């Protein structure tokens, strides 16, 4: 085993330790906020407050990703559809608020604790869209090398992906992160994400 291998394994271990520590801390500190978000969604929905959907994670393995429900129960009765900011009628009133501040993502703290996700990494996608992206750019498979994230470099600078062209652009940002990831870059992404969430800036 080379010095580079040891350094890489140590970096992966430390990032995982950081993810667990921060996720546990946030779950405790954010209990009032989690309860408030739960109540906002509960008063508008007859069904489940939580939305779960299969996504593809590290090593290409599927997992269930959790969110607070922000759309109507029948949002995808006609099949997979991309969210379109500002003009998506499937969004509920509470859901619009949660999405504006990205609070619908809070349940993914559980995904982090389970080891499915990291705080920072490429956003996990559905197999339906991965298959279509891979036809255009097979480099997507490189992203399977790391855990997907709650936030990402691509999310901050590419925003919501409501077209295939934006998905391909997001992939370029994700590949940049994959090959340039560092503690400094992760800190920049996390701090920028929290700042945008507080001010309600769209990203």
Regions found by a protein language model. Give the residues of each.
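Positions in alpha-helical segments
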Residues: 23, 51, 92-96, 173
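Structural signature of FAD isoalloxazine-binding scaffolds in flavoprotein oxidoreductases
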Residues: 2
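C-terminal terminal-structure detector
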Residues: 5-10, 141-203
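Acidic active-site catalytic centers that drive phospho-/nucleotidyl reactions
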Residues: 19, 104-105, 174, 186
């Amino acid at each position: 085993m080379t010095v580079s291998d040891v350094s890489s394994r140590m970096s992966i271990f430390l990032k995982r330790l950081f993810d667990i520590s921060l996720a546990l801390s946030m779950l405790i500190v954010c209990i009032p906020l989690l309860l408030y978000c739960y109540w906002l969604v509960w008063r508008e929905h007859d069904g489940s407050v939580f939305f779960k959907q299969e996504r593809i994670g590290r090593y290409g393995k599927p997992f269930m990703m959790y969110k607070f429900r922000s759309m109507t129960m029948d949002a995808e009765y006609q099949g997979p559809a991309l969210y379109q900011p500002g003009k998506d009628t499937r969004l509920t009133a509470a859901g619009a608020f949660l999405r504006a501040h990205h609070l619908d993502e809070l349940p993914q703290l559980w995904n982090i604790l389970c080891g499915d996700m990291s705080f920072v990494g490429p956003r996990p996608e559905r197999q339906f869209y991965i298959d279509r992206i891979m036809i255009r750019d097979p480099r997507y498979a490189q992203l399977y090398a790391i855990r997907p994230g709650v936030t990402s470099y691509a999310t901050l600078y590419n925003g919501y992906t409501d077209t295939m062209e934006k998905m391909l652009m997001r992939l370029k940002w994700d590949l940049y992160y994959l090959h340039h990831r560092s503690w400094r870059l992760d800190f920049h992404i996390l701090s920028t994400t929290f700042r945008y969430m507080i001010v309600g800036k769209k990203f």
